[in-house]
């Protein structure tokens, strides 16, 4: 089993090269028309399986379609990756939508709503005391 340093190094290399493939080699208008970014790569300890989490400025429905398109094109992406990097075996890849950003934004929205509600409540209390 490779050490953490090797996992991080290979993950970083995969992220860099897959980003370049998405930007330059992949001929998919949906992916090119929306800002698609790789947010995280989970690489298995044996370097055989790779989960690639993507973020995009697109709406959730479009992001789902982008992920489907990427998973449809994963064999050609993997083939291009094999030409770019020297590895004994290029890992099997699967693309997933990274929903962490959406969850974070919804939490911030809830916090803002609570803050506004609390401020309105404090103003009403001050008015009632006057």
Swiss-Prot record:
Molecular function in Gene Ontology: ribosomal small subunit binding
InterPro entries: KH_dom-like_a/b, RbfA, RbfA_dom_sf, Ribosome-bd_factorA_CS
Single biological process term from Gene Ontology: maturation of SSU-rRNA
One Gene Ontology term, aspect cellular component: cytosol
A family per Pfam: RBFA
Record's subcellular location: Cytoplasm
Keywords: Cytoplasm, Ribosome biogenesis
Region forming the signal peptide: none
Keyword Chaperone in annotation: no
SUPFAM superfamilies: Ribosome-binding factor A, RbfA
Family note: Belongs to the RbfA family.
Known role: One of several proteins that assist in the late maturation steps of the functional core of the 30S ribosomal subunit. Associates with free 30S ribosomal subunits (but not with 30S subunits that are part of 70S ribosomes or polysomes). Required for efficient processing of 16S rRNA. May interact with the 5'-terminal helix region of 16S rRNA.
Assembly notes: Monomer. Binds 30S ribosomal subunits, but not 50S ribosomal subunits or 70S ribosomes.
UniProt-listed HAMAP family: RbfA
Protein name, entry field: Ribosome-binding factor A
Source organism of the structure: Prochlorococcus marinus (strain AS9601)
């Amino acid at each position: 089993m490779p050490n953490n340093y090797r996992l991080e190094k290979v993950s970083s290399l995969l992220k860099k090269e897959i980003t370049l493939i998405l930007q330059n080699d992949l001929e998919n208008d949906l992916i090119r028309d929306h800002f698609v970014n790789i947010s995280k790569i989970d690489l298995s300890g044996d370097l055989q399986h790779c989960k690639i989490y993507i973020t995009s400025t697109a709406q959730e429905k479009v992001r789902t379609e982008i992920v489907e398109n990427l998973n449809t094109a994963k064999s050609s992406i993997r083939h291009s990756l094999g030409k770019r990097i020297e590895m004994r075996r290029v890992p099997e890849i699967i693309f997933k939508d990274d929903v962490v950003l959406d969850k974070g934004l919804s939490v911030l929205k809830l916090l803002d709503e609570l803050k506004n509600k609390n401020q309105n409540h404090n103003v009403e209390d001050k008015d009632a005391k006057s």
